[in-house]
Every structure is written in C-alpha cells, then in structure tokens.
C-alpha cells in the first residue's frame, strides 16, 4: 500500500475546491444548495446540502470517470489489495448484482449457498442464470446455517462442471466463514470464477487476526459494504476486481442499473472512509475486536444467553469466525431474538442490528465506545431478570432447505395466483418471503412450499419479525404459480 498517496481524498478535495468558488448553479439538483428547500437545509445543514451537487468536469462522472473519481478508484484498489475498484452508490445490493451479471448470462449455472442475501437471487431473476444451491450445515443448538464446506462445494462442482461461477458469503451475517482460499483454488482449477459477498466483511481487509478477505484469498470479485463497518454513508459500497476480470466490461454491466445521478455525498464518504481505513484501519479494528470480545465474555456471565465466537470453529462448516460480530443466542431465556430486539429498543433505547427467531446481532464497529457496550450488557442482564420465561414450544430453527422446482426468473415472470398461506403447501412460490434484516429468503421464486416452511413463516410473523418480499403486507396470502410450472 502506498501510504503517501493514501493520505489524499481526491473527490472530497475536489468538492472543497468547488465549494470555495461559490459557483452559481443553473443545473440540478433543484434545491440549489438548499435555498429552495429551507427545511431540508435545516435538517441536513447548509454544508451538507451545498455539497449535494451534479456531475461536472471538475468533479468527474461516475459512469465514465477520467479524473478525481478515477483516482479515488485507484486508491481504493491500492488500499484493498485489488487490481481495480468501483465506487457504488446503489448499496452492496448493486455490487452483488453487478458481480453476478458480469459472469452469468441466461442459462448459465452458478453455485451458491442457499443462505444468500436476496440481492443475489434477484440477480438471477434479472439475468436468467440457474442456481445450484449448496445447503449449508445447520447448527442445531443455535438454529443458524453455517458456511459452505469445501466438500459440499466440490461435490456441486463435480456434478455441475458447466457452472461458470461460485458465490461465497465472507462472512455470513452471524460471522461464519468458509474456507475461501481452498474454494477459490478448486474453482479456478475448473475454470470457474469466484465471487465473494463481503457485505459484512470490510474490516477483513484491515484488521489483524481476522478471517482472510476475498481479494487476499484470490477471489475474482468482491462486493464490500463500506457503510456497514467501514464508516461511510448508508448506501455506499465498493466492488473489487482481481486481475482475471475485464474492468471496463464490468463497468458496462454496472452502468446498466446504476444511477446516472450519483450522489457526491456518498462518493465523498467512500473517499474519506477509504483514507481513514488505509491510515488507521488496523488500529481501529483491533479496538473493535477487543470490544466485541469483552462484550461476549460479559454477556456469557449473565446466564441464559450464549454470545458465540471462535469456539464454533470446526475446520469445515465453520472454517473461521469474524470476532467483530457480536451474535447472541437468546432462547435460553425463553425469548426469541426478535423479542429481545424489540425490548432493547422499546424499553432501553438501544437499537441493535437485527433479531430473528433464535438470535440477535449487535453490530460493533469503528464508531462504538466501551460505555455503549456496558449499557448493552446491562440491558441484557435486566431483560434476563425481568422477562425470562419458559421456552417450551418455541421454534429453534432459522433455516429450512427448500426444493428448487423452477428457475427464479421463470417463476418470477410466470402467471400466478394468490392463495391463503395455509393452502399453498405443495405449490411453487412465485415471490420472495423473508425476515428483514437479514434479508435471506425463507422462500424464493421457484421453490416448493412445504408445511414446515408455512409454519415457520407464520411463527416469524406472529413473533414480530419484519416480513418482506410478498405482495400481501399482512403475510396472510402467498403468490404461487398458477397450474404448476
């Protein structure tokens, strides 16, 4: 890494030069530096709305960068150990979909874990690729799906030698990591590309004693959520490329769906955050890992909770663990994760990342403080004392392996009918059903509905999970394929 170059933030510096010129705007956006919308200026501040500007020669253009954005991309690539990098303003959803669209066309097969984010399956709807799912092992105690085992991936490769790519979560939402280096080696030996979904892995590029990053493992592409653990603004992300990819071809794919009016607030936040991580990331994430480990130890002293970590590593389905993730099993207190999630927010003014049926996740990152950790630990102890109940009759599984009957694209565009949820068993789903977060589909278009899946959906709904993907906001009806396939 070139530390001298990494001290620069070319987009931010260009914005500052532009701001000082006091240019009179006769272009968009129409709020004209906030003057046309005083309430917006009051909410965000005059400097913020003053930097919400349009693409122009001094500020470059994200769709075809030739100056400051191009330089910012080069600095990202240098900092992350990539050959090329793209700044993304459509979130990591856009980055994941661009990865898949760059390597898959209609009819191509892609090997991926079923516990992928909905953005990956949405990409299959867009391009018509065929998923070859690897159903990961499930930890029976925690009710969470683990990582893809090398043997599972190798079996899928052997059975589908015509597959063009393998997608790997690195890490999962819960912090679970697969043996990415070995998967890359075996995929490349078969001529397959490897895509790393690192929506929750920005820190892997800078922290010490953390799981291997996608680029370091030799993956061909990696989608990285800078806004999650890297400090940039929500919706800003990165797409990293290794030498095997044609960068300009990938840019063409990105430009199919990415906005032509990129936000300079998002772009400059990526620029500044990259500089911060390049110069101070190792120290910052060492502190993050220390806070997360301290929280784990304190929470496990309470009783009724299990804050898991490196103890899950088994060399196969849990090859490594991201110690910055504070994932906590809650059923020992007779409380679903979503119930603890709601209690923390409503009774203790603590907002955590998500709660599902069995677990909660508190996202620890560069903006956290030890006093905040202490407050979380205290609240969890209070909840254990005041709200603990019998866990009899509670579901304990987060993941049900579905049967794929039709491709996501085929099912998504097929003629459908709406049926009461209880009457859909044996039918083929025509839409997504998921708890969000984490956004991993319980059902995806083209998958068979089973009694177990219906019971899980209704249980999650009744426990208060935020359900998404369905046309029916009440989660009482499901769109299924009319007359089968």
For each of these PLM feature ranges, what is it?
Residues 1-67:
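N-terminal "arm"/small-domain region of PLP-dependent enzymes with the aminotransferase-like
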Residues 49-91:
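Conserved N-terminal alpha-helix of the aminotransferase class I/II PLP-enzyme fold
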Residues 84-107, 123:
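Conserved beta-loop-alpha segment that forms the PLP phosphate-binding cup at the N-terminus of a helix
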Residues 108-168:
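PLP-dependent aminotransferase-like
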Residues 143-203:
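Active-site phosphate-binding strand-loop segment of PLP-dependent enzymes
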Residues 212-251, 258-269:
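Active-site PLP attachment segment
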Residues 273-296, 372:
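Structural signature of PLP-dependent enzymes
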Residues 294-469:
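Conserved C-terminal alpha-helix-loop-beta "cap" of PLP-dependent enzymes
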């Amino acid at each position: 890494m070139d530390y001298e170059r990494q001290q620069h933030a070319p987009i931010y510096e260009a914005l500052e030069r532009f701001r000082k010129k006091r240019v009179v705007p006769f272009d968009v956006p129409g709020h004209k530096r906030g003057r046309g919308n005083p309430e917006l200026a009051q909410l965000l501040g005059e400097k913020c709305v003053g930097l919400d500007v349009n693409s122009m020669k001094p500020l470059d253009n994200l769709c075809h960068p030739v100056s400051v954005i191009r330089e910012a991309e080069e600095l990202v690539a240098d900092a992350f150990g990539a050959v090329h990098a793209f700044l993304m303003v459509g979130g990591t959803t856009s980055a994941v979909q661009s990865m898949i669209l760059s390597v898959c066309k209609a009819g191509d097969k892609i090997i991926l874990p079923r516990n992928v984010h909905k953005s990956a399956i949405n990409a299959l709807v867009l391009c018509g690729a065929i998923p070859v799912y690897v159903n990961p092992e499930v930890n029976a105690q925690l009710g969470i799906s683990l990582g893809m085992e090398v043997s599972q991936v190798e079996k899928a490769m052997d059975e589908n030698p015509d597959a063009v790519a393998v997608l790997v979560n690195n890490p999962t939402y819960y912090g679970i990591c697969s043996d990415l280096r070995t998967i890359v080696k075996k995929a490349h030996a078969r001529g397959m590309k490897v895509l790393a979904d690192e929506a929750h892995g920005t820190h892997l590029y800078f922290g010490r004693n953390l799981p291997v990053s996608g680029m370091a493992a030799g993956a061909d592409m990696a989608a990285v959520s800078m806004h999650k653990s890297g400090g940039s603004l929500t919706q800003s992300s990165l797409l990293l490329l290794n030498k095997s990819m044609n960068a300009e071809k990938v840019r063409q794919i990105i430009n199919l769906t990415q906005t032509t009016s990129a936000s300079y607030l998002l772009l400059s936040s990526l620029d500044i955050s990259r500089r911060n991580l390049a110069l101070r990331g190792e120290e910052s994430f060492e502190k993050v890992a220390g806070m997360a480990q301290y929280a784990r130890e304190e929470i496990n002293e309470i009783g009724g909770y299990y804050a898991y970590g490196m103890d899950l590593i088994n060399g196969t389905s849990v090859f490594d663990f991201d110690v910055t993730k504070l994932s906590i099993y809650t059923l020992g207190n007779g409380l679903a994760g979503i119930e603890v999630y709601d209690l923390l927010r409503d009774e203790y003014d603590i907002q955590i990342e998500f709660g599902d049926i069995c677990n909660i996740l508190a996202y620890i990152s560069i903006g956290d403080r030890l006093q905040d950790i202490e407050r979380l630990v205290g609240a969890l102890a209070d909840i254990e004392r005041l709200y603990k109940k019998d866990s009899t009759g509670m579901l304990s599984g987060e993941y049900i392996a579905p049967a794929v009957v039709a491709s996501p694209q085929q099912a998504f565009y097929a003629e459908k009918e709406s049926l009461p949820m209880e009457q859909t068993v044996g039918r083929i789903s025509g839409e997504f059903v998921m708890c969000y977060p984490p956004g991993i589909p319980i059902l995806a278009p083209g998958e068979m509905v089973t009694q177990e899946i219906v019971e899980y959906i209704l249980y999650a709904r009744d426990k208060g999970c935020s359900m998404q993907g369905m046309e029916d906001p009440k989660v009482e009806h499901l769109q299924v394929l009319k007359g089968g396939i």
